[in-house]
Each structure stands twice: as C-alpha cells, then as structure tokens.
C-alpha cells in the first residue's frame, strides 16, 4: 500500500485533499490502522470518533474538534459517514456544539453550523454492525457545499432551534424538532453539565447540546451525488 509518508503535512489546496481522500478509497480500516501503527478497537462504543481521527491522520488535518474547520487553512470540514450496503447513512452526523448562552445578535451567517458546513469533504465508510471494524472499507469521497435549497432548510431549522434556546426553552427541544437539523444532548455522562438560560431568564445547568444533521438530509445528498 503506497499512500505517502505519515503523517502528511496539511494539504495546500482542495485538489490535494481530495486526491489524498481518493487514495484511501477501497482500503479497510484495519489496513489503514496497521500502516499508521494504530491499535484498532474491537468496536466504537467507547471511542466513537476513532474512524474520523484515523482518516484525519492520513489526510493531514489540524483542527481536532476546535470551532474552526478540520482543514482550516483551506476552509474544509471532514465528515466521515457510516453507510449501509445500499449506500444509506446509518446515523445522524454531528456538526458542532450548540452555544446555550451569549447568543444575543447571533445570525445564521455568523453561526458555527454554517461555517462548519460551508465546504465539507464527506468520506463514506462501511458501517453495518455485522462487519468487523477492521474489515470495513473506506468509500469514495465527495466534496460538497450546500445548494440554495439545502442552505435554506438548514437556516430555517437553525433559527427555530436557536430561538428556543434564547427564549429559555432548551429543555423542551427534542430530536424531533427540525426538518434536517436536530439538537440533542452531547455528553459522555449525565454529570457533565453546562450553563444555559431557563424559561424565566435565570441561569440553569443542563446537558451540553450538539447540532446534528438528520439522515433525511444526508441520505438524499449522498444518493444525488453517487446516483444511488
């Protein structure tokens, strides 16, 4: 397997990043982990982000989970997406942590969600549970930016969810809110609380929340680009 020296320097442009991602297509996670000298976990229960970290290593990402994009110098976010044998997404896609305080004056145009989704390198990975992690293959990459219709759907959901947060209704929001974007708790344990605004404007402690893309958004997007 000849990929390149590891870990590579951050990519200098979109074309170089896409070429690197294309070079990984068809390899199993076991092959990539072995080449990188990484231990492969038995499953992803305790280390959900492992696949993304492995691919970031190969692609030369720098941001980790900081607010900027994974490839901040060229303005691109990496999103791995587990897919079924039919090419359909198997789970929702984490976008970023939701701000629960200090939101006066925030707009869709200046939001982290819009920033993170402005330009995305999607890398599908086999995700069906009966396939052992080491045997799951990496799929063909896709460079994507939301079209007008997609951006409008995202903006509408984001504004509705942020209105509820600002009005002190964060604890009334369920995963069913939003057509394509949902807000739900993001915490490894229920003791990791963060400050938010309550219904009467008072500070409250609640679970951190994250924005996630629903499968009803990523499914049609993948189908359109890969002609499924």
From Swiss-Prot:
Keywords: Cytoplasm, DNA damage, DNA repair, Endonuclease, Hydrolase, Nuclease. It is found in: Cytoplasm. It comes from the Bacteria. The keyword Nuclease applies. One of its GO terms (molecular function) is DNA binding. Its main location: cytoplasm. One of its GO terms (cellular component) is cytoplasm. Sequence-specific endonuclease that cleaves unmethylated GATC sequences. It is involved in DNA mismatch repair. Belongs to the MutH family. This is DNA mismatch repair protein MutH. It comes from Yersinia enterocolitica serotype O:8 / biotype 1B (strain NCTC 13174 / 8081).
